Amino acid sequence: MQRSRAQVALVFLVALLLRVIGLADFLTADEVHHWITRTERFSAAISGGRWAETILTGHPGVTLMWLASLGLHLERTALAWGWIMAPDRLGHLAWLRLGPVLAHALLISVGFLLLQRLMPRHALLAALLWACSPFLVAHGRLIHLDALLADFCTLSLLAIILAYREPPQRFWLALSSLFCGLALLTKGPALIMLPSIGLSMVALALPPPPTWTWPSGSTWVVRSIMGAIPRYLVWLGMALVVVVALWPALWVVPDQALGRYFSEIIGNGGRANGDGQFFLGRSDADPGPLFYLISSAYRLTPIEWLGLLCIPLFMWHQRGTFDWPMGLVLGGFVLFWFFIMTSGPKKFDRYVLPAWPTLMILAAWGLNNFSAWMRQQRPALRWLSPVLLAFQGVTLAWYHPYYLSYYNPLLGGGQVAQHMFLIGWGEGMDRVGAWLTAQRDINEGQVLSALPHTLQPFLPVPVQAVEALDRANANYAVVYRESLQREANPDYYARIQAGTPLTTITIHGIDYAWIYQLPKAYTTPWPAQFGSGLYLRGYSLSHTPQQLTVTPAWDVRRPIGADLLLFLHLYDSTGTRVAGVDVTPGGDAFPQTSDWRSGQQIAVPIPLVLPADLSTGTYTLVMGLYDPRSGERLPLSIGEAANPGMAGANALWLGGIEIANDS
């Protein structure tokens, strides 16, 4: 008993710690656009007794909003007692995530207790794989539906197996109904559980005939179906009671609630993703029948793969003692879920998460049998299973908190996966924000980005969508991989990507984002190039009787490698220099041109003081750059050169300037 309690505590702590540490990391698009607001509105509706207002989405997401509301209540309690300061957007998100995270840890622990009764030798490893699979951990840290649906579906399935294996049957039947009801309140695909549980009851109702013939087999099928029907109807009735009890909208406006529920399934789930998908290197609204097989292969770890690959071998080896009914129920559920998801046009890899814990249970069975076989061959390998599990733990530590970036390294990991699957849900925006915030000129304009609300909490300046390129006073633009894969706004991105990216945000081999600086504004287009990498887009000019101010708009296309000075000279009609200045072209903000990066856009006003006695007339303005150590000018390779007899070699002619001296 003491050992069992310790194991339950271990499973709970592992599941909790992997999901609770560092919850204020980044926002996913669905959280920031949907679930934060839905949770706040749901909580307010419950508090005010406005039951009809608990219809916030057709998913319906009721269990998720209940759990996130728990986190919201904990946050408000901590604020009221003065335990915390008012949290920012990310801190608020972390509190809302806390409720679902606690639920995951508790539900996985319940799963372990059920597995102890079904397969005591494999229960601990199965529960730990359930707790430690990167795919489940990644989604279990979010305010989102699929990981929660996975827990409820798996527990309902395990409980129905126990209903046919261990008394009291009514208790396990009721427990399975409870979890199925919670699954139905979470997301529409839980309807798959209704035929799944029915078929499981048929498979478990009676022992199969020892010798399978057509008469004996058909008799067994008929008797199993007839025996399962009464229990199934009771089970279904209890599940529906749970649904009605926990969704207040069904108490007052059941027609509206159910209408939204089925409209979501038919209207949203029954069509290809409106924002597009990406698979095997091309944008495709419906990725086709191989999508889940290939994407799941990449989401599994090598250890999980090993366990699954061992299953056929040890099933054959133990064919005389293998628990075929339970194997049929578990394996059949996985295959059935994959089949239904594959048959629909809308596909995301997370849609098969409800089958993932069952896959982990099967993988644990395979791993334990493999370890037992290895121990027979080499007794020194008795610690193989713990070592493999420890390796999985090291993998999780390495990927924290970017578990969504995990792809099987044996298949090329993220470096290969980024060219095969749609990648980017908001992860990496924290690093984008950190890099941009560190730039000296970050406050000189707005930032453009896909998924702007996922980036905004990390920046001190406004973030707008890429579509605002022509109307926003934008300084930087973020090109996010997901948008390129979906071929969103191709014209805007083509213009942004015409430049050179300042940096690439790479996480675990995946290039998530490229940061570009947008061209600085100028009034006079004047293309020119100095050396091999410093390009002038144009310039702006203003003047007073005392001063000319020239603002060149530079585009750094290659590193310069030296600290240059800029000269700005003014000549009269006789070719005599009447004013000039030699300064650093980047001013105080970017004084050393050797530090200028490829892709950087720089526009610093250069003041040129005019002599007080300068007469009215037309003057020639020239500009160039030189190395102050050698005095050598940077070659002018593009642009109209000034008269070398007047201005010297490699001086750019900026045109004639009319100056009126009113004194």
Regions found by a protein language model. Give the residues of each.
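C-terminal luminal/periplasmic domains and tails of membrane-associated envelope-modifying transferases
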Residues: M1, G413-S663
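Membrane-interface transmembrane helices that cradle and orient dolichyl/undecaprenyl
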Residues: M1, Q116-R117, S156-L173, A183, ...
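Transmembrane-helix signature of polytopic, membrane-embedded enzymes
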Residues: Q2, A6-V11, A80-I84, L106, ...
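Short helix- or helix-capping micro-motifs
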Residues: V11-A15, A126-A131, A138, L158, ...
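Transmembrane-lumen/periplasm boundary regions of multi-pass, lipid-linked membrane glycan transferases
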Residues: L18, T37-I46, P60-L67, R76, ...
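Short acidic/glycine- and proline-prone juxtamembrane loop motifs at membrane-interface regions
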Residues: T28-D30, F135-L149
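Transmembrane-helix motifs of polytopic, lipid-linked glycan transferases
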Residues: A94, L98-L118, L155, A159, ...
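Hydrophobic/aromatic-rich transmembrane helices and adjacent perimembrane loops
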Residues: D146-A150, A183, G188, I192, ...
